[in-house]
Amino acid sequence: MFAAPINMFSLAYPEKSSNWTNRFQMFATQNMWTFILLDSYNGRLWQVQYSTQDLDNLFCIPINKYELVENNERCIFSIQPLTSMYQYYLINDNTGDMWKFQWSTKGDDYRWIERFR
C-alpha cells in the first residue's frame, strides 16, 4: 500500500512559479471507486481507489513506476480511454510517443504499461 500525505505547506499551497502547480491530474474511470492519477510532467501513473466503508480499501498503487522522459525534461502527458474501461493511451503531447496501460482491481499482474509503436 502507498500513502504519502501532503503535510508540507509549500506542496499543499504551491506558488504560481512552483514546479508543482498543475502537475498532477486525476481522471475518473467508469468504476466509481477508481481514479487514475497522472504526473503530467514525467508520465508516471497511479491507480487510486477509495471506499466509503473502511480505510482498508483505500490505496494508491503505481501503474508506471518509472519516469518516461530523460534528463528531467518537462513534457506534457495526457491520457485517452480505449474501448475497454480498464485500458487507456498515455500520450506525450510534445513528441507524440504513446503507451498503452491497464489498471485492475485483480492485482499487480493485471496492471501494466507498454510502449505503443
Tell where the protein language model's regions lie, with residue ranges:
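Trp- and S/T/G-rich repeat-edge/linker motifs of beta-rich repeat architectures
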Residues: 8-20, 52-73, 104-117
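Structural signature of eukaryotic scaffold interfaces centered on beta-propeller domains
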Residues: 25-30, 79-83
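Hydrophobic membrane-insertion alpha-helices, especially the h-region
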Residues: 1-7
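Short loop/beta submotifs within extracellular cysteine-rich repeat domains
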Residues: 42-47, 54-55, 95-100, 107-108
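Short beta-strand motif characteristic of blades in beta-propeller domains
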Residues: 33-40, 87-93
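Tyrosine-centered aromatic motifs in long, intrinsically disordered, low-complexity repeat arrays
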Residues: 9, 35, 46, 50, ...
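Solvent-exposed interaction surfaces and binding hotspots enriched for charged
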Residues: 25-27, 36-40, 46
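Short, solvent-exposed interaction modules
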Residues: 65-103
